[in-house]
A protein has these predicted regions:
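Absolute protein N-terminus
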Residues: 1-2, 88
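Short, structured coil segments at secondary-structure junctions
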Residues: 45-46, 63-64
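Short, hydrophobic beta-strand segments that form beta-sheet elements in well-ordered domains
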Residues: 34-35, 47-53
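Glycine/Thr-rich phosphate-binding loops of Rossmann-like dinucleotide-binding domains
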Residues: 59-60, 77
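Ser/Thr/Gly-rich flexible loops in soluble cytosolic domains mediating phosphotransfer, phosphorylation
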Residues: 66-88
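Short, polar loop motifs at secondary-structure junctions
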Residues: 39, 52-58
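Conserved active-site segments centered on acidic
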Residues: 2-38
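Short acidic active-site motifs
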Residues: 37-41, 78
């Protein structure tokens, strides 16, 4: 499974999100290839899932990947809830 964590510039915030997603997936016992990028580059990628904010998700409407919305990239409980709801 490939997961792409997306923020506006693809550096700071998406890196934090990627680290938190990797930690939550590890706790859940799920293996995945998790990467981070900016919203423009994400349009050309084809992962299984894209995790991003509600605002940036609007820029990815029509994308072939399943979009998972996370509003607080630092909140591992929110990330876990979103992953459980979408990966099940």
């Amino acid at each position: 499974m490939k997961i792409l964590c997306v923020c506006g510039l693809g550096q700071g915030t998406s890196l934090i999100l990627r680290i938190n997603v990797e930690n939550v997936l590890r706790e859940m016992g799920i293996e995945a290839d998790v990467e981070n990028t900016d919203v423009s580059s994400a349009s050309a990628e084809h992962p299984d899932y894209i995790i991003t904010s509600n605002e940036l998700a609007q820029s990815l409407e029509g994308h072939s990947s399943k979009i998972i919305i996370v509003n607080n990239y630092f909140d591992t409980n929110e990330i876990k809830t979103a992953l459980e709801a979408n990966l099940a």
